Amino acid sequence: MGRRNRRATRHGESSKSALIDCHIPEEHFLQSTDPKEKTKNAGGAVEHTPLMKQFFAAKSDYPDLLLFFRMGDFYELFYDDARKAARLLDITLTQRGSSGGAPIPMAGVPVHAYEGYLARLVALGESVAICEQIGDPALAKGLVERKVVRIVTPGTVTDEALLDERRDTLLMAISRSKQGYGLAWADLAGGRFLVNEVDSADALEAEIARLEPAELLVPDEDNWPEFLRGRIGVRRRPPWLFDADSGRRQLLAFFKLHDLSGFGIDDKPCATAAAGALLGYVEETQKQRLPHLTSIAMEVASEAISMNAATRRHLELDTRVDGDTRNTLLGVLDSTVTPMGGRLLRRWLHRPLRLRDVLVQRHHAVGTLIDAAADADLREAFRALGDLERILTRVALRSARPRDFSTLRDGLALLPKVRAILAPLDSPRLQALHAELGEHDATAHLLISAVAETPPLKLSDGGVIATGYDADLDELRRLSTNADQFLIDLEQRERASSGIATLKVGYNRVHGYYIEISKGQAEKAPLHYSRRQTLTNAERYITEELKSFEDKVLSARERSLSREKLLYEGLLDALGTELEGLKRCAGALSELDVLAGFAERAQALDWSQPELDSAPCLRIERGRHPVVEAVREQPFEPNDLDLHSDRRMLVITGPNMGGKSTYMRQNALIVLLAHIGSYVPASRAVIGPIDRILTRIGAGDDLARGQSTFMVEMAETSYILHHATPQSLVLMDEIGRGTSTYDGLALADAVARHLAQTNRCYTLFATHYFELTALADASHAGGASGIANVHLDAVEHGERLVFMHAVKDGPANRSFGLQVAALAGLPKAAVTQARRRLAELEQRGGESHSAQMAPTALDAPQQFGLFTAPSSAAQEALQALDPDELTPKQALEALYRLKALL
């Protein structure tokens, strides 16, 4: 009993309350048996106590989940569950009784605070089965009946307390075939269900990086890509659950349809298989209907700008490379007022669109809000809006709480004001959103008349339904209300008749109404008082009059709560019929919140409306880095960018800390912002078609995959060379620095040539290899590769080094590496030694090395003399051929390839 006493004292509960409330005798804990630790009775059979039988029966259905086993005021965990929970939650691991001569490990959390513990477990990727007492302990003869009523997993949570209000919580399923992978994901808290198909593991990794699912379902098979192995939240399921035919049947049955053509997935078997597996898992864990999932949508990859996982990480969209979420693009951009608006903005940020018409409408809407000064009015109205999207989900799942109703009521009451703000605005998108808001006056009136102004947290507290809504409920409440005056009058009468001035009339939930007299006055108690309870310092009594009153009042209160629950269920039914329109309304309000936030940011930060051009170009005038500008105290130095068909690559040189990486990132972020519908931090931005943003910036060892810094660098570079197109924007920062000087220089040169000649993408190529600046001269000689030099400079002022942060045409003439080292605090002796060594190197071979590394044309690789007797590409291809293995057709194709290499 030591553990129970300690915990009960901490939570202010009786040490035996849980056992008494559950009618679980102490001996039910003793001699109980874990199946792994069997104890046999005299007949040789394994024997369990009633409590342990009940626990094992529930646990056997959910062997891989933590089981929260309700025992009165606590949820208990036993055996391995207890050990795991104690470690993850930092709660006490204790024991009670024994099993097979060994103690029974136990850990528990109080019911009134369990949501906090549950949230921590879910965040760690754990799933929990909630086993509740479904019988009334007061009526139970023996053990209280229990049943698993709910399963909480990282991807299926809908409770407000378990969710991040500004981030989607997604459940994803992945199937695979010879053609690639099928993905399905659902936001149960928001009512969204989507699918997609990708053709490679790289594309799959990019989608997972974009969506960041909390839970991932995959077939229990081998050879999954490495990035999935060991990932938190991955759950292996039987492979037969990922069958395309059964998935199709499951979707048809769920949506009550005859075909899936309306969803656009009839010819997507891999995505259909994933969707069926996901839907089956949701139905299995939620144990109820899911009326808020009304459709399934196919995401089309070509409609969005592609960004792989490395690009998202390098650009620090919502999380910095070090894991911090502050000082990110989202942190600067997010001016939304509502949680649902914040979630929509995050989705837009991670899926910038290529749909020019959609983006132009968004830009125009933002400009209209600014011109009409309507953004401030909208944002002020939205401050009282609440998270309608998730509230509607809880309404659909019939788990809405009283204050969800009042928040929904107050939100719907704002619609006339929002419509009035939008009505005069001349913007196609704003008028479309105005129409999507719909008319919900009847629903608003219902909630205004039915829900109390400030309802309690729980329905069981009573007082949720407004006075005047239901006559029967009002009558029952009058009985309870008049009870207070009756008790005051009774107390005064009894004090007068008994002569006991300290006599009190009170009530508690265990013993009901009572008359309390102190121990010192107890001998004066009238004869018609019947003792009800003895306390340390007082005696409590009951009289016939008080008993009669108690029966009447308690009956009225019970009937009042019962009536209120019935009316509450009626409200859920009524709202259920309006869900579709209300969901569209919530979606429109979310988008309006984002657009109004864009307008606020544009004005506060002096951003301008971008121009989306159909011609290939990327022209940015006086562009700034949105995050760096926001966090630094000094004015930000704006810079231009001009790329087009004849100028596709900039080789960027300059000192460390000069701003090369900032310059590259700011241009990528400006492009991204333009493609979500936002204004951009530039005086002007003209942006042609962009299909991908690919980056190779910075590096670090990937210890989990056993990859060095250089290996990570080469893997990311390889991805870019294989995927960049003439419409891609590529950022390359310091390629080759992770290996020896000559190897690094050779690789950097080869990568730059490949990007310029083969990929022909827009490229910002920052480097410390000054030899690469000769590529621009070779570009002019070759005529077609469009390479130019720009640099960022610094000036020495006495012993100080001042970085100018201005981008200028031409190559840098100094690196200032030693000056930067001195700024970093290297000992003066080390810097002096470095200066001497640099002078020796420059005198000994710097000039000849530079001459050797200066090719005159991009099509003359034989001039690049770093390696002994370099073979030509044609020679290498010819040596790789095996004539005996070639068919006539393959031989002819090989001949054409060889000719092209000459």
Swiss-Prot record:
InterPro entries in alphabetical order: DNA_mismatch_repair_MutS, DNA_mismatch_repair_MutS-lik_N, DNA_mismatch_repair_MutS/MSH, DNA_mismatch_repair_MutS_C, DNA_mismatch_repair_MutS_clamp, DNA_mismatch_repair_MutS_core, DNA_mismatch_repair_MutS_N, DNA_mismatch_repair_MutS_sf
Xref: CDD domains: ABC_MutS1
A Pfam match: MutS_III
UniProt-listed GO biological process terms: mismatch repair
GO molecular function: ATP binding; ATP-dependent DNA damage sensor activity; damaged DNA binding; mismatched DNA binding
Keyword hit for Lipid metabolism: no
Domain of life: Bacteria
GO CC entries: cytosol
Gene3D superfamilies cross-referenced by the UniProt entry: 1.10.1420.10, 6.10.140.430, DNA repair protein MutS, domain I, MutS, connector domain, P-loop containing nucleotide triphosphate hydrolases
Alphabetically ordered keywords of this record: ATP-binding, DNA damage, DNA repair, DNA-binding, Nucleotide-binding
Residues annotated as binding ATP: 654-661
Role played: This protein is involved in the repair of mismatches in DNA. It is possible that it carries out the mismatch recognition step. This protein has a weak ATPase activity.
Protein family membership: Belongs to the DNA mismatch repair MutS family.
Protein name: DNA mismatch repair protein MutS
Organism of provenance: Xanthomonas axonopodis pv. citri (strain 306)
